């Protein structure tokens, strides 16, 4: 595979994302390509895309193009919230994620942890549309009704687990790529079930939206492996959330710092 440079990747993305009424701007300071269409904006971090390209080849670029196209398609469509309660889900994002749209519409959110925040979205099949507070009034629905519907729908999603073990420490991965892998962190019944199953300390991570990691940590090696794993996923994710794992105790999630082969207390 030929060496991919920032300029080559920028040109390739512009070519594959070219469309009528679509503009591009490039920020050389942070190597970011911004795509604008009908007032909607998507910013792509070129270095991150190149890193994914080096691992996955053309599939990494195809995935980016797909997400951008579906995102613009979802933003352009009118979503009727009233008849879509069965398609509403909670979505986990970093606390730094914007709480309003570029047009100034406030998004429907709930607090979660010091690192994460809950947003709500209408599933559109291949993408989803974040719910704005103004949509509630139009649909004559309350925040609580949306929250209840979203969490009920989340509880009905399957949770297939893949397991890996390192020196007696077990790691479970949820990676369905349905857009709600990280959201399964919000499934309280699932967390309680896993807590009963695990024998060590239960530590979870949502480095990006398309993965949930659950560690059954027995020793410092387990913490070390989880720390490196979380950082790797965080760097590779299209929608990063947080590089900090969470300890799950007594029904609560507490962010912790892990460095090298030692665990630092929360």
Swiss-Prot record:
InterPro entries the record matches: DUF1444 (IPR010838)
Alphabetized NCBIfam families for the sequence: PRK13668.1
Protein family membership: Belongs to the UPF0354 family.
Protein's name according to its UniProt entry: UPF0354 protein lmo1608
Source species: Listeria monocytogenes serovar 1/2a (strain ATCC BAA-679 / EGD-e)
Taxonomic lineage from the root: Bacteria, Bacillati, Bacillota, Bacilli, Bacillales
